[in-house]
Amino acid sequence: MVLVLLALLAATAPFVAPYDCLASQGILNAKNLSPSLDYPFGTDQFSRDVLSRVICGSRVSLSIAFLSVLLAAAVGTVFGAVAGYLGGWLDALMMRTVDALLAIPRVLLVIAVATLWDGVGIAGLIWLLGLTGWFGVSRLVRALVVSAREDEFVTAVRGLGASDTRILAYHVLPQVIAPVLVAATLSVGNVIVIEAGLSYLGVGVKMPDASWGNIISNGLGDGNFTSTWWVWLFPGIALMVTVLAVNLVVDGLRQALSARQLPAR
C-alpha cells in the first residue's frame, strides 16, 4: 500500500506539489526557513520549498529505479534464456562473460562511467543503471531455464514438433516470470539507494532537477548538517520509507511464491 501511494504521488507530482519545484519563494525572505504551516518541510538556501522538491524528487528517483530495473530484467531474461536453452559452448561462453562482469563492483563501474560521461542526465542514468544491473538476473534465468527445458511436458511438446522459439516463449519463460519479478522488485530498493548515492556525489541527477540524492547533498553541503537539518532529513526519510516498503513487498512476493511451490496435500 505504501509503495502504491508513493507511485501515485510520483505520477501526480506536478499537480500535488504545493509550489513549483524549481522556483524560489522569494530570495530575501524565504531562505532556509524552518518547517512551518506555509512550508511544512521548510525551504533551502535557494528559497525553494523542500516539500515540493521531495515530491518532485520522488518522481525522478522512482522513475529511474523502475525503468532501469525493467531494462535490466528484460536484458537479463533474454540473455539467460538463450544461454540456458541452447546450452553447450555458447552457454559456457555467455556465463563466463557474466562472471567476468560480476567481478567488477557495480557501484564503482557506474561511478566511473558517470564521471567520464559528464552530464549523464536522467535518461542516461536509466540506461547506465539498467545495463549494469542485468548480470545477476541472467544467471537466475539461465538456471531456471536449464531446469525447465528438462521437464516432461517440454520434452513432449518438443516431440510434437514445436519450434525452439515457441517452446521457449510459451512453455519455458512463463515458469521464469515469478522468480524474476521477485529479483527485479528487490533490485528497485538497491537502485534507489545507488541513484541517491550518485546524485549525492554529484555524478547522478544534476541540479536544478530534484532527486532525493541531490536534495540530501544540498542539505548537507557547506556544513549545514544541524543548521538546516530539514533540507536533508525529509528526503532521507522518504528514501528510507521507500526502500523499506520495497523490501516488505519482496518478502510478500517470496512468501507467495513459496506457497505456490509447496506440494498439494
Give a label for each model feature.
Residues M1-T77, A81-V82, W89, V107, ...:
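Gly/Trp-centered helix-boundary motif
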Residues P14, W134, S138, S187, ...:
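Alpha-helical transmembrane segments
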Residues P40, D44, V50, L71-G76, ...:
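Generic hydrophobic transmembrane alpha-helix motif, especially the helices
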Residues F66, L70, A74, V78, ...:
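Hydrophobic alpha-helical segments of membrane proteins
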Residues V78, G88-W89, S163-D164, S187:
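Short coil/turn motifs that cap or connect alpha-helices
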Residues R96, L168-A169:
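Conserved glycine-rich helix-kink/hinge and helix-boundary motifs of the Major Facilitator Superfamily
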Residues L102, V113-W117, V145, L186, ...:
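Glycine-rich helix-loop "coupling/hinge" segments at transmembrane-helix boundaries
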